[in-house]
Amino acid sequence: KDNPKKQMARQMIVMVNTINRTNFGGRRVVTCVTCHNGSNVPATIRKLDAVYGTPTTDEPGNITRQAPGAPSVDQILDKYIQAVGGADRARALTSWVAKGTYIGYGDASPVPLEIQAKAPDQRTQIVRTLSGLSTTTFDGRNGWFAAPDAETPIPLRALAGSELEGARLDAQFAFPAGVKQFLTSWQGSIPATLGEDRDVYVVQGASASGLPVKLYFDFETGLLVRQIRFVEAVLGRNMIQVDYDDYREVAGVKMPFKWTWAWQSGQGKIELTDVQANAPVDAARFARPAGAAR
């Protein structure tokens, strides 16, 4: 027999699904976050500091129209291409090889990392953990994850669903020249603020599965500073956030040397120390891994 918490969770799932089915045609308009927002007990009284204190910046909802006075999606993406070095230089970047470090949430110290990427959408990331090599590969169509037995119950598995889609986006965004083709169904742009004082424009498109993907571009520099994509789950959509920082010029193209991935159950940070542009990359680098190696 399941414990009371599991029984309650199942009852809540049924309740939320019933609300959405009855009132919104089955669309996931109401989720656990709508009421609980991270708390075991939903708040029923509004706090006064929410009325009289400094307003907090919430994640913008779905963008459905162009904000008055904001630049168009094309203008924002064109400025981004100019910011990284211009269309000609961006197109001239066809591959790159990088070294750096990776640290996960709760890890004691960073470990060595290598990335090989080839335009338009191939990417392999190798993290040298204490247990062995952890490899994520996307060959332009298929993806795999290989890791030591000590870190995963399945040493080699094919990526599917949201994991495969995320690997594709990471491979595509390694080469900014094609940014307009990465997503479809662009919805317009809105101004927003990250943190306390970073003004950005947010544009929204759709991934191959139709889920929204939001891109955040700095007001002044035009550079991409954040990507947010979504994963469909039983309890609603989960968010995956990728932050880009420390842009440096490599062969005339500005590239982020710091990336931070954050999701519901973890976080990973990459810091690159060396990037070689247009370095030769063997096609075998993007093949299905043989399995975890030491």
Regions found by a protein language model. Name each.
Residues 69-74, 81-96, 174-181, 196:
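N-terminal helix-cap/turn-to-beta initiation motif at the start of protein domains
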Residues 1, 29-39:
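The canonical Cys-X-X-Cys-His
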Residues 35, 47-78, 294:
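Intrinsically disordered, low-complexity terminal tails/loops enriched in metal-binding residues
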Residues 42-46:
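Short Cys/His-rich "knuckle" micro-motifs
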Residues 145-173:
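Acidic/charged, solvent-exposed loop-and-adjacent secondary-structure segments enriched in E/D, K/R, S/T
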Residues 124, 129-132, 194-292:
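Gly/Pro-enriched, hydrophobic low-complexity segments
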Residues 81-151, 183-188:
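N-terminal mature ectodomain segment of secretory-pathway/periplasmic proteins
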Residues 1-27, 47-64:
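Sequence context of c-type cytochrome heme-c attachment sites
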